[in-house]
């Protein structure tokens, strides 16, 4: 192989390794068998959520994973592999791909990484069942509001009972 080609591939490995290091979550899938329409729909859904989705050669993925400290992921890079990277929302790629896989039998989740740790297919599917960041924040706020609301109701009840006595 010429030195120019080797340099270009090394640059690709570095670029993918940087994406892997920066990603909050990574989902690796086998998209073999998807129709063009299904693939386009999946890519559009991921793009709308700020998720980058690419088909990358397994040799480049394997070297990039090793370089990014995700050597445990190397077993996933067998057969056709497409990778979804999300830098912000940990749940988004897993949720979108898992939901899409329910309707498109050809899409198979292989595994991935969650916040820098290699994860199995089952871990990714469990992550997909969680609410997204906004959903979790709203759940947290409702939990925090409940005690305050109960105190307010108690104060109101005491005030009403004192009015009834007077």
Swiss-Prot record:
GO terms for molecular function: large ribosomal subunit rRNA binding; structural constituent of ribosome. CDD domains: Ribosomal_L10 (cd05797). It comes from the Bacteria. Pfam families: Ribosomal_L10. PROSITE patterns: RIBOSOMAL_L10. Keywords: Ribonucleoprotein, Ribosomal protein, RNA-binding, rRNA-binding. SUPFAM superfamilies: Ribosomal protein L10-like (SSF160369). GO terms for cellular component: large ribosomal subunit. PANTHER family: 39S RIBOSOMAL PROTEIN L10, MITOCHONDRIAL. Part of the ribosomal stalk of the 50S ribosomal subunit. The N-terminus interacts with L11 and the large rRNA to form the base of the stalk. The C-terminus forms an elongated spine to which L12 dimers bind in a sequential fashion forming a multimeric L10(L12)X complex. This is Large ribosomal subunit protein uL10. It comes from Streptococcus uberis (strain ATCC BAA-854 / 0140J). The gene is rplJ.
């Amino acid at each position: 192989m010429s030195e120019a080609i080797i340099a270009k591939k090394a640059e690709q490995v570095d670029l993918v390794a940087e994406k892997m290091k920066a990603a909050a979550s990574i989902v690796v899938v086998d998209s073999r068998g998807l129709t063009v329409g299904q693939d386009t729909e999946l890519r559009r859904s991921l793009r709308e959520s700020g998720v980058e989705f690419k088909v990358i050669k397994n040799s480049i993925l394997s070297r990039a994973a090793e370089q990014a400290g995700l050597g445990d992921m190397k077993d996933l890079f067998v057969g056709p592999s497409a990778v979804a990277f999300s830098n912000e929302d940990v749940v988004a790629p897993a949720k979108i791909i898992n939901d899409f896989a329910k309707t498109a039998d050809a899409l198979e989740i292989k595994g991935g990484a969650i916040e820098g740790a290699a994860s199995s297919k089952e871990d990714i599917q469990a992550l997909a069942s969680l609410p997204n960041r906004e959903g979790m924040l709203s759940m947290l706020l409702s939990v925090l509001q409940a005690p305050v609301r109960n105190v307010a109701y108690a104060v109101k009840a005491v005030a009403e009972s004192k009015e009834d006595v007077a």
